[in-house]
A protein has these predicted regions:
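N-terminal helical capping/dimerization or prosegment-like subdomains
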Residues: 2-96, 308-312, 325
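Active-site metal-coordination/substrate-binding segment of hydrolases
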Residues: 79-147, 430
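Acidic, glycine-rich active-site loops and adjacent beta-strand->loop/helix elements
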Residues: 88-90, 146-154, 177-182, 205-207, ...
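Acidic/histidine-rich catalytic neighborhood of metal-dependent amide-processing enzymes
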Residues: 117-192, 447-448
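Zn-dependent metallopeptidase/amidohydrolase metal-coordination segment
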Residues: 202, 226, 293, 305-309, ...
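Acidic-enriched catalytic cores of C-N bond-cleaving enzymes acting on peptides and small amides
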Residues: 212-293, 321-343
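A short beta-alpha structural unit
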Residues: 316-318, 345-360, 384-386
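Short, low-order "capping/linker" segments at domain edges
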Residues: 355-373
Length: 448
């Protein structure tokens, strides 16, 4: 099919693609513990039906975790096979009061579709479906569509699924549609992602809670103890202060501080922390954040000193760093700096490898050409991402000859993982066009 034919086909398919995306968004498929996992099952069934509708041999697979979907269509003679990855599970919606509308009832406002998963990553699923629908029975490559069901919860069973279905997943090109673009109107290839270590730190100072008036003063309550300990993780500039955590500088993309402040929603008067350029700080240097604290709610807090306090700490690792070494470094720092002789327990929740992709060669040239065409001549950016997709390292290890392309539908205003997550509908159509053109270009580049 010609480029103009593919563009026209995508345009024809978009109403149906959007309707199917909205149906997916209405399924609250959260893989976290404590949520109704029957919705994740429903989501997997819906995705499987979409892939079967594209003519793929499709199965739902699971190995101890939430269901994934694998759809396959054999390559024409001499043509390459492309693996198309996305995930159908979503983050919890959080407090509904923070959303302008129901998080699981998609609503369009000002050219954006709002709803949990509208961008991350059900639109990634539908970008794959849109490209396949555009080709119909003229698909020039083989495809394996792999849609995971627990990415947001750490992909615990993903390695097992990959190893159990290794030959089915083996491909020449891997497209991971779980990232985003540099800006509205500016496409991007993601070429580096930080690694991740999530851990817990719990301090204990008392056998049980005691009266804050009778004992307050000489007794170090657990919340203040924990607060002082967490404060040692950064210096006065907000730079990570843990020996052994290293990064590098020199990210090449200019990211003005005022744009970053706007996109992050930083309040007036609040300083940025750390040192170096914005891109260094979010792409190539480590960061440490406190994601939550176990403590009494203020409305329920009694006049009592708390015996224990616990924090969840998230460490993002610079590309090239080892998660185990990073965990050991942070644990050693906490153990060295725990105040007032408090008892401390540090435990690992999860970790994931960072990755760097050498985005050179004919497949990457084909991808950039597809992006350039879909965005009417705009040159794509090679960018880093501060977040993590740990299984990319697994793909790199198991399929070393495959070219890995990290793409996606998000833009700086998508608000993934937060309230009012949204998808720019105009950019979504460009993403669908780009993926169809990518498959066309890969076929022309690699068919023997």
């Amino acid at each position: 099919m010609s480029e103009s034919d593919l563009r026209a086909a995508i345009r024809r398919e978009m109403p149906g693609v959007r309707a199917d995306l909205e149906r997916l968004v209405r399924i609250p498929g959260v893989a976290f513990e404590g949520f109704d996992h029957s919705h994740v099952e429903r989501s997997a069934v819906a995705v499987a039906e979409l892939l079967r509708g594209c003519g793929l041999d499709t199965e739902i697979v699971r190995h101890g975790g939430q269901p994934a979907v694998i759809g396959r269509k054999a390559a024409p003679a001499g043509a390459p096979t492309v693996l198309l990855y996305a995930h159908h599970d979503v983050q919890p919606a959080g407090d509904p009061a923070l959303w302008t509308s129901d998080p699981f009832e998609p609503v369009e406002r000002d050219g954006r579709l709002y709803g949990r998963g509208a961008a991350d990553d059900k639109a990634g699923v539908m970008a794959h479906v849109a490209a396949l629908r555009a080709f119909g029975d003229q698909l020039p490559v083989g495809v394996v569509v792999f849609v995971e069901g627990e990415e947001e919860y750490g992909s615990d069973s993903l390695d097992t699924i990959i190893h159990e279905h290794l030959e089915e997943l083996r491909s020449d090109v891997i497209v991971i549609a779980d990232s985003g673009n540099w800006d509205i109107g500016r496409p991007a290839l993601t070429t580096s992602l930080r690694g991740l270590v999530n851990m817990f730190a719990e301090v204990r100072v008392l056998k049980s809670a005691v009266h804050s008036g009778m004992f307050g003063g000489p007794v170090p309550d657990a919340l203040i103890t924990l607060a002082r300990l967490l404060a040692t993780l950064h210096d006065d500039d907000g730079e990570v202060a843990v020996p052994g955590l290293v990064g590098r500088e020199g990210a090449s993309v200019d990211y003005p501080a005022d744009r970053f402040r706007h996109e992050a929603g930083i309040l007036d008067g609040v300083d940025l922390i750390g040192r170096g350029t914005i891109t260094d700080r979010i792409w190539t240097k480590p960061s440490i954040s406190v994601l939550g604290v176990d403590a009494p709610r203020t409305l329920e807090a009694a006049n009592a000193l708390q015996p224990t306090a616990k924090a969840k700490i998230s460490v993002r690792l610079a590309p090239g760093e080892d998660p185990k070494s990073a965990y050991d470094a942070v644990r050693a720092h906490l153990e060295k700096n725990v105040p007032w002789g408090a008892q401390l327990e540090v435990t690992l929740e999860s970790d994931g490898q960072p990755c760097v992709i050498d985005a050179t060669g004919p497949v990457y040239d084909a991808a950039r050409a597809a992006f350039r065409s879909a965005w009417d001549g705009t040159e794509p950016v090679d960018m880093g991402v501060g977040g993590s997709i740990p299984f990319i390292a697994t793909f790199q290890e198991l399929f070393p000859a495959a070219a890995i392309l990290v793409t996606g539908v998000e833009d700086p205003y998508s608000g993934a993982h937060g309230p009012d997550e949204s998808l720019h509908l105009g950019e979504f159509e460009r993403v669908c066009v780009a993926e169809a053109l990518l498959l066309k270009n890969v076929a022309e580049t690699m068919t023997r």
